[in-house]
Regions:
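Conserved, structured core segments of small domains
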Residues: 1-125
Length: 125
């Protein structure tokens, strides 16, 4: 089964305007790198990346008529994604165990979501 581990860092939350030039503390990056290496020995790590702050992003909203483009930051947004891991594991519990070991900062959140398999969309006759 594949799972997304979605990092919701405290530094991006609460409508905080994070400087477009923001980069995480090098010591935290190194610590996270060690965590990623260790996790990759246990789970199949398919992809991972950190995301620039929402101040550097844009959002496309679909409603009636033409889509609307809004440049970041998105003050009305409750939680802002800061990075992700895409892993393959035997169970959600296995992923939760690794998420709990993450060297996250106080106030950070990791959300675990299972990825749909193509079999999940198979039409049943």
């Amino acid at each position: 089964m594949q799972f997304m581990m979605l990092m919701i860092p405290a530094v991006y939350q609460g409508g905080k305007k994070v400087d477009p030039g923001f980069v995480p503390d090098p010591k935290k990056v190194e610590e996270m790198g060690r965590f990623n290496d260790e996790m990759a020995k246990s789970l199949k790590l398919l992809s991972l990346n950190g995301l620039h702050p929402a101040t550097m992003g844009a959002r496309v909203s679909f409603g009636k008529g033409k889509p609307t483009v809004t440049d970041g930051p998105f003050i009305e947004t409750k939680e802002v994604l800061g990075g992700y891991w895409l892993v393959e594991a035997k169970s959600k519990e296995e992923v939760l165990t690794w998420a709990q070991r993450c060297p996250a900062a106080e106030g950070d959140v990791i959300e675990i979501r299972q990825v749909f398999d193509k079999e999940d969309f198979a039409i049943k006759k």
